[in-house]
Amino acid sequence: MGNYTIKIAKGLENNSDAKIIRENVFIHEQGFENEFDDIDAAAVHCVVYDGGYPIATGRLYEKDGAAFLGRIAVLKAYRGKSIGSIIISELEKYAAENGFGECMLSAQCRVKGFYEKLGYTAFGDEYKDEYCPHIMMKKVLSKPA
């Protein structure tokens, strides 16, 4: 693993760096149109930096009393280096420390295996978000030490 810095902040504090990554990955690379939403203002954002440069992001938010992970994105040059796993681990830790017993997420079906390796289990039927097939997944969290 490289010498990365991780920043977690609630609300808009991390949004400018998170937006750079999300625009690059979800809009320019994957072609999504509706990337930003009202959830961003209240979500907890995790951003990973390499030498001060934002390279990956993810968010955690509460919906109907449950913790949801979302918008997990790693710049192409940094994929395959366990950075996505770092983001998820940090957000799961934050969720557990704040009383949540499980995390849920909406995964693009093409990366379902990545989440399964991290302990997530798919449930429900596949559905499309814009043009892309997705599946709901969940994981029971370990209690914080």
Where are these regions (language model features)?
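Conserved acetyl-CoA-binding loop-helix of GNAT-fold acetyltransferases
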Residues: 74, 80-93
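Conserved N-terminal entry element of GNAT/NAT acetyltransferase domains
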Residues: 1-12, 142-145
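Active-site rim helix/loop that mediates acceptor-substrate recognition in acyltransferases
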Residues: 20-51, 55
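A conserved beta-turn-beta hairpin within the catalytic core of GNAT-like acetyltransferases
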Residues: 62-70, 79-80, 129-134
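Conserved beta-strand in the GNAT
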Residues: 47, 53-61, 66-73
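Conserved GNAT acetyl-CoA-binding A-motif
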Residues: 88, 95-108
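Conserved catalytic-core motifs of GNAT/GCN5-like acyltransferases
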Residues: 104-106, 116, 121-136
